[in-house]
Amino acid sequence: MAVNIVRMMDRRNVSHETLDNISDRLVDLIQEDVDYANALVKEYKKGKIVDDEYFLKAARPQMELVELSIKALDYIESILENGKLDAISDGIIANNLLLEVVRDAMPTIRVNLDPISKSYDYDEKIDYAKKLHNRNQQIIERRLKWQEYM
């Protein structure tokens, strides 16, 4: 949703292949997340030791979701900078949603990776997403202040 809502700000109405690819992949990830989680639960219910690969597969969609959200946070900078000011609220919503996606994915990733002692730098991902979010927020605030003077 966040990836598509930021398009409301676009002045040129041009294709953003990067956003299109992110959006398409996110749709696929929804089903992968469900499928891999179901496979993990099915294995767990057998009462035997669950192979590490099931945990890793269950974590992968959320891990990719984090990467795609970070990529989108970086990509929307130019849209926030140059997009329609009358649609800035859409940019604010997209910026905030993308950061929350990164934060909210972490518990699921942790639940799936902790049993197999697989390392993942949760703090690094969140910190980088916050950095991009803050940069975008500064652009938004600057544009809103500029609007006040017009």
Located regions from the model:
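Conserved, well-structured ligand/cofactor-binding cores
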Residues: 1-150
